[in-house]
């Protein structure tokens, strides 16, 4: 399997590439990656693996895309994006990277005739705020940020190009992934900071209330789900090309309790609360989420809070 990872140097992309190089099974035939092409605007550490090819370039540059897809491609993971906070502050940049670059990728693949699997990392940002009292697989997206709008349009494009046979498109709606490195462009970064800083013995000021429920998933778990998306048979994706991932719905206090169980009871004394009105409105009232079809076809969450906090700091 010839694989291209777009956004390979990001938080999820690095873990996905590492898993691919450990021969994670891909597709219905469970084949390993024979070649992994990394594409990002800036390359990280070089790989010694002969199965890795690096293409440094802007994902909105069709020449860079053509180099990445050169020689044929069987599976594309599109992970690159400008996150919510940055996309709100820099509208033109968000539009170019999140939307126009996605169109350019799809058009480049259409022109090439490769017809690969195309795994699109969408987002729960498509639902906007306030959310309905329950989210399920029939809930109609209603994004309230540019980032969510870009992701929803991306889903529709992936489904349409899939319907027309230009690609084998599969979109997964990704929740907040922990524990990301520090970032100024992501509104939900405090969820990652909480786990990372409390695990490291630091004090943490939480910008939402202790009883605020959020949706949680570790990086290894989202990589599991992205890889699983490649294995779904055609009859599954013909019926539905966008999948809502199962999540753990946990309050801040439940996550802190799990951290205390893993790292010691002193963890509970290192957190204080100063709710921020904007973050409280955006992240403090996530409703129950039901996605029985996604679970039926094999997508999974981390299991429980203890597993989440243990896996959250794993490299891949």
Please give the residue ranges for each predicted region.
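Active-site Tyr-X1-5-Lys
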Residues: 129, 142-170, 199
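N-terminal Rossmann NAD(P)H-binding glycine-rich loop of SDR-like oxidoreductase domains
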Residues: 1-26
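Glycine-rich NAD(P)-binding loop of the Rossmann-fold in SDR/ketoreductase-type enzymes
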Residues: 60, 89, 93-104, 141, ...
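Mid/C-terminal beta-alpha module of Rossmann-like enzyme folds, strongest
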Residues: 225-279
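NAD(P)H-binding glycine-rich loop region in Rossmannoid oxidoreductase-like domains
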Residues: 56-97
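Amphipathic terminal alpha-helices
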Residues: 288-295, 300-316
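Conserved Rossmann-fold NAD(P)-dependent oxidoreductase catalytic core, especially the SDR/UDP-sugar
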Residues: 103-146
């Amino acid at each position: 399997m010839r694989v291209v990872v777009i956004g390979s140097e990001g938080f999820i992309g690095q873990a996905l590439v590492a898993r691919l190089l450990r021969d994670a099974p891909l597709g219905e035939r469970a084949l390993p990656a024979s070649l992994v092409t990394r594409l990002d605007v800036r390359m990280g550490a070089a790989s010694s693996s002969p199965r890795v090819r690096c293409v440094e370039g802007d994902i909105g540059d069709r020449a860079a895309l053509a180099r990445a897809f050169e020689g044929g491609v069987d599976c594309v993971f599109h992970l690159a994006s400008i996150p919510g906070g940055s996309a709100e502050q820099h509208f033109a940049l968000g539009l170019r990277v999140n939307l126009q670059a996605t169109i350019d990728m799809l058009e480049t693949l259409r022109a090439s005739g490769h017809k690969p699997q195309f795994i699109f990392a969408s987002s729960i940002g498509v639902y906007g705020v306030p959310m309905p009292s329950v989210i399920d697989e029939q809930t109609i997206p209603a994004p309230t940020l540019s980032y969510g709008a870009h992701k929803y349009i991306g889903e529709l494009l992936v489904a349409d190009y899939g319907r027309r046979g230009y690609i084998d498109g599969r979109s997964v709606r990704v929740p907040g992934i922990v524990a990301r490195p520090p970032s100024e462009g992501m509104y939900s970064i405090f969820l990652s900071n909480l786990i990372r800083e409390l695990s490291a013995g630091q004090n943490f000021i939480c910008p939402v209330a202790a009883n605020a429920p959020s949706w949680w998933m570790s990086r290894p778990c989202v990589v599991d789900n992205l890889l699983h998306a490649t294995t779904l048979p055609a009859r599954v994706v013909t019926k539905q090309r966008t999948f809502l991932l199962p999540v753990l719905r946990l309050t801040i206090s439940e996550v802190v309790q799990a951290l205390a169980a893993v790292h010691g009871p002193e963890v509970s004394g290192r957190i204080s609360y100063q709710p921020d009105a904007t973050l409280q409105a955006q992240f403090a009232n996530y409703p129950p989420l039901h996605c029985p079809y996604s679970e039926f076809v094999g997508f999974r969450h981390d299991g429980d809070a203890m597993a989440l906090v243990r896996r959250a700091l794993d490299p891949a």
